[in-house]
Structure formats: C-alpha cells, structure tokens
C-alpha cells in the first residue's frame, strides 16, 4: 500500500457512503457502499481474505469516497456509479437480462405485445417469462383467442383480421375488459372458464358443421393447457413473491430467482458471476438493485441478507425485502439454493473455460499493444453503396463482452469528394467530440475495420480533437477473413488463426461488420422505396413510413391486396400508388 492511500484511509469518516477503488492508471476498478466507510474500506487490508479479494486488493492504488446521509442513499448512489463507470471487478448485470413479458397496452384499443422492457405506465405486464420460444407460442395463442387490437392504424378502417372477428371494428370496450380479465386468470393458472368458453365454441361449430373452426377451438384448448401447465409449478398456497437463492464457490457466484405468482412458479432465471469481494451481502444487494431497476418487481422479495440491506432495498423499491421466516418460505428458499448448486455444478466448467479464454485473449492483446487495461473497446465499420448512402456502425465491448445497449448507428454526410477515408474521419470525430463535450469516459482502445487507410483517418480525427486514445485496425485477407492487426505506425501483426486472440478479434470484426451491413440494408430498402415511389400524390412521409413497417420490397407491395393497403391509405392515394406500381 502506498503512502497516499494510507493517508486517505486514515481520514475516512465513520459515516455511510460509497467508495471507489482505483488502480495505478487511475481507472475505477470497484465501487461499493457501506454503512461505515472507515470500517468497510479498512477491512480490505486487515489480513488476507481469500484469493478473490486479494486479486482486487493487489490492484488498488488509490481511493475516492462520497459521504451520504444513510444506507438507502448509498444504495442508490452505488447503483448509479456502477452504471456510469462499469468497473471491471463489480457484478454487472449482463446485456439481455431484461426478461420477456406479455403486455396489454393501456391504449384506448389495447394491444397484446411481447416485450423485453418493463414500464408500468404503459400497460399491464405478465411475467417475467422463462423459455422465450415457448412463451412466444403462448403470446400467439392468446392473440388468436382474444380480440385485442392487431393494428396501428385508425380504428374505423377494416383490417385483415376483420373477418376473423379479431378487429377493433367488431369489438366493444366491454369486450376488451373481459379479455383482460381472462388473461389475468390464465396467468394465475385458472383455465376453467376460458376452456369452457372454447369448448362451447367448439360444440357450436360442430353443430353448424363448421369443422375447420371446431378443430381450431379444440387445438387452442390443447395448446393452452399444455403451455401453461409446462411452465407453471403449483405451490400449496396462493402467494405472489420472488425467491432469491445464491451459491458461492471458487470465486464464482450463482444467483437464481424464482418468480411466483398466485402460488405458481412463473419464471426461473440464473446468472453466474466471477467475484472479487468477500462481502456477499453487498454483492447480492448490488445485483438486486440492477435487476429490479429494469425488471418487474413482486410485492414481496425473500432473500437471505442482513437487516441493513433488506431495509435499504425495501425503501428504494417500496416493496418488502425479507428473510425467510415461515417454514413454507424456508422450504422454497432451500429449493432455490439446491437449484443454484445444481446450476453451478452443471455450468461452472463451461463458464470458467469461456472466462479463461476471454481473459487470455485480452491479456494477449494488452501485451501486444502494451496497454494496462481493456475495460472498454469501441469498434467501428463504415459501409456504403458506391459511396452513396454512407453509414457507420459502432459496437462496444465491455470487459471483453459485447454490450448491445451501447452500440450506435451513424448516418454519414455525402460530399463531392467523399471516400472511405472521409467517412472514417467523420464518424470518429462525431463520436469522440460528443464524449469529450459531455465529459464522458473515453474507451481504452479504438478498433477500426480496415487497414492503413482507415487507421490513418481515425488518427487524423483524434489529432484534430487533440485527444489520445490507443488505436488499431483489423485487416482482412483476399478471402475476406480476419488476417492482421494494423498498428498506428503502419506495422502489421499477422494473427495465428489457431489462437484465442484470433477468435476474439475475428468475432469482433464480424460483429461490427454485420451491425453496419444490417443498418445499411435497412437504409437501402427505404431509399429504393423512396426513389421508386417518389411523386405519388398523397403519399406523404408518414404514410410512406407506415408502408415500410409491413412491406420489405416493391414486389411485396405489388402483391398486396387493395383491402390490405386501404388499412394505410385513402382510396384516392391507393389509386395513385397502383398507377405508379404498374409502371415499375
């Protein structure tokens, strides 16, 4: 421990707050909260805790701390700081940890939607749901049974669901409320009423010799019973709560969540994390702050935590966070723990192997480039069609893993003398001019898809901004396969195709290429539509964009029936559109 850190530790008060450990390069590597900052920070250096803590402690070179009024404020501040700085030794909720929900919107004409974001102000949510494929089948089944609005257009226009009696033209507001009530009962596992309705419809169809619909109603009954029963485990009571179980071994932590609704297990989710802090209470609390900040929360959360953290979480989310108190809750918590152990034993070998491969790749790259850290890598690729419709894509690797939430798309300017060189200058300038002006953290490394031309363009842009960020290019061979690292001095390092580093960089280059190409394809489709349908009288921007949502090509548009297109267009505009399409 250096003298500066020793002196700072002596001055820390016995008050609640957050502490930020920094390494020798002034990078924040871990953020924690404490009821007593002095006791908590000193505990890291009071003898060797274990391997996981020693790895963190060995990298500590400096400290910052922020004093707050109470533990609840510290909890909120810690969560915000972790989201801002993304420290390498903190538990970070993985990208894609927003679990799926089935949602009924609170619009005048409600729609049933399958979503991965939770916003209680937008409607009624059912979930979170496990096994996305099976639950999407449930979504489609519910949409076929109940007459929720299927369209985005005005309610007075007929749509393709009109003849199926699933159109807003044929549904009263009272019917929507009945449908919502039925869906609520289904997610409680109460199928008797809806099955009786479907059976009645089936019998009525048979009486009318309408065997096609009779078969449909019979299949709906079978599918509904199968999907619901396969996904729900019945308890012997009628409670709604979440159970949090966790298991720690060999510097890894498994956290498992059971979501019970009205006595039925609706979802089971599990995550595995490498950990570097000995205080499990703090790690679990940090995870729960992140998880419930972006997922639906139950009215009761049962988790084995100390009283201070339970109280802080309860105050933060205005719901009950409690230890298991009854025999029933203890039995379910034991079940969650058993599941966490089983998950650890069945998955940990694969998790460790993947993490070791990732660590090896990052260490090799750090060694080659002589860089201390690679927490954040930003990778760029430009794309265009004969220098028209130029775009750029940027993907972000956080601690070696792709974080899709941080990816960005750029529409680039076209000029008379535009080239790939100028496009790269533009996107690098726009990205880092913004980060600097907003005082945001710069990446540890920039990777550009390309050779010397692209590297020199990026270097020029950074020089104009007067900032210095390590930079490399990834060059491909004649077969369009990743081949070599291009350094800023023009030297190339040919990659061994059997190495872990090659696999890591090739995946990165493919990821950014696919991201950019996908964006270009969407833009190109829109451009073709725009040029071919230009000057169609009455087809304004709003109607044009609505058509793009449903038709991927001019051929799709040509084959659409008038009845379909009248959902989006007045009759006179449809006539004008048909005249234009017939000339193409």
UniProtKB/Swiss-Prot annotation:
Q: Name one Pfam family in it.
A: UvrC_RNaseH
Biological process per Gene Ontology, one example term: SOS response
Keywords, in A-Z order: Cytoplasm, DNA damage, DNA excision, DNA repair, Excision nuclease, SOS response
Q: Please list the residue ranges annotated as the UVR domain.
A: 192-227
UniProt KW ATP-binding keyword: no
**What cellular-component terms does GO give this entry?**
cytoplasm; excinuclease repair complex
| Domain called GIY-YIG: residue spans | 14-91
Q: Where in the cell is it found?
A: Cytoplasm
One Gene Ontology molecular-function label:
DNA binding
- Which InterPro entries does the UniProt entry name for this protein? ConA-like_dom_sf, GIY-YIG_endonuc, GIY-YIG_endonuc_sf, GIY-YIG_UvrC_Cho, RuvA_2-like, UvrABC_protein_C, UvrC, UvrC_RNase_H_dom
SUPFAM superfamilies (UniProt xref): Concanavalin A-like lectins/glucanases (SSF49899), GIY-YIG endonuclease (SSF82771), RuvA domain 2-like (SSF47781)
| Primary residence | cytoplasm
The UniProt similarity line reads: Belongs to the UvrC family.
Q: How does it assemble?
A: Interacts with UvrB in an incision complex.
Q: What does this protein do?
A: The UvrABC repair system catalyzes the recognition and processing of DNA lesions. UvrC both incises the 5' and 3' sides of the lesion. The N-terminal half is responsible for the 3' incision and the C-terminal half is responsible for the 5' incision.
Query: What is the name listed in the Swiss-Prot or TrEMBL entry for this protein?
Result: UvrABC system protein C
Originating species = Ureaplasma parvum serovar 3 (strain ATCC 27815 / 27 / NCTC 11736)
């Amino acid at each position: 421990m250096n003298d500066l850190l020793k002196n700072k530790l002596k001055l820390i008060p016995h008050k609640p707050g957050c502490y930020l450990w920094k390494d020798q390069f002034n990078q924040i590597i871990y953020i924690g909260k404490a009821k007593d900052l002095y006791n908590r920070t000193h505990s890291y250096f009071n003898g060797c805790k274990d391997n996981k803590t020693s790895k963190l402690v060995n990298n500590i070179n400096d400290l910052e701390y922020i004093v707050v009024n109470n533990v609840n404020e510290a909890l909120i501040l810690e969560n915000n700081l972790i989201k801002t700085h993304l420290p390498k030794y903190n538990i970070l909720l993985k990208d894609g940890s927003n679990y799926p929900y089935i949602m009924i919107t609170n619009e005048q004409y409600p729609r049933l939607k399958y979503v991965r974001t939770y916003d209680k102000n937008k409607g009624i949510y059912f979930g979170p749901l496990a096994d996305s494929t099976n639950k999407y089948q449930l979504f489609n089944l519910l949409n076929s049974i109940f007459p929720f609005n299927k369209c985005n257009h005005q309610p007075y226009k007929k749509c393709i669901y009109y003849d199926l009696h699933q159109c807003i033209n044929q549904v009263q507001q009272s019917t929507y409320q009945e449908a919502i009530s039925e869906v609520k009962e289904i997610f409680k596992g109460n199928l008797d009423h809806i099955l009786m309705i479907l059976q009645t419809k089936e019998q009525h169809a048979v009486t009318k010799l309408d065997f096609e619909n009779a078969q449909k109603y019979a299949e709906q009954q079978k599918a509904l019973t199968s999907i619901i029963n396969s996904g729900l485990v019945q308890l012997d009571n009628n409670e709604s709560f979440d159970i949090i179980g966790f298991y720690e071994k060999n510097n890894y932590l498994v956290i498992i969540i059971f979501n019970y609704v009205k006595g039925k297990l609706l979802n089971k989710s599990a995550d595995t994390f490498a950990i570097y802090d000995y205080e499990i209470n703090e790690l679990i609390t940090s995870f729960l702050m992140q998880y419930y900040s972006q997922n639906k929360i139950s009215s009761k959360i049962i988790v084995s935590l100390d009283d201070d953290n339970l109280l802080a979480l309860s105050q933060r989310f205005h719901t009950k966070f409690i230890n298991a108190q009854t025999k029933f809750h203890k039995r379910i918590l034991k079940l969650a723990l058993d599941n966490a152990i089983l998950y650890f034993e069945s998955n940990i070998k694969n998790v460790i192997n993947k993490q070791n491969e990732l660590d090896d790749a990052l260490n090799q790259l750090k060694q080659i480039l002589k860089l201390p850290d690679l927490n954040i890598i930003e990778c760029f690729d430009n794309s265009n069609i004969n220098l028209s419709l130029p775009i750029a894509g940027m993907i972000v690797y956080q601690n070696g893993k792709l974080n899709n939430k941080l990816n960005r798309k750029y529409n680039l300017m076209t000029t008379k003398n535009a080239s790939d060189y100028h496009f790269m200058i533009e996107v690098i300038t726009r990205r880092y001019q913004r980060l600097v002006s907003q005082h945001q953290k710069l990446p540890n490394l920039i990777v550009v898809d390309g050779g010397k031309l692209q590297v020199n363009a990026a270097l020029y842009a950074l020089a104009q901004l007067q900032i210095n960020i390590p930079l490399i290019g990834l060059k491909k061979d004649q077969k369009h396969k990743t081949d070599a690292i291009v350094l800023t001095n023009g030297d190339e390092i040919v990659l061994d195709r059997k190495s872990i580093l090659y696999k890591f960089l090739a995946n990165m280059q493919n990821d950014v290429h696919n991201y950019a190409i996908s964006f270009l394809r969407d833009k190109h489709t829109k451009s073709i539509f725009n040029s071919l349908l230009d000057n169609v009288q009455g087809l304004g921007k709003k109607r044009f964009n609505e058509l793009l949502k449903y038709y991927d090509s001019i051929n799709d548009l040509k084959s659409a029936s008038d009845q379909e297109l009248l959902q989006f267009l007045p009759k006179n505009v449809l006539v004008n559109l048909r005249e234009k399409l017939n000339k193409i």
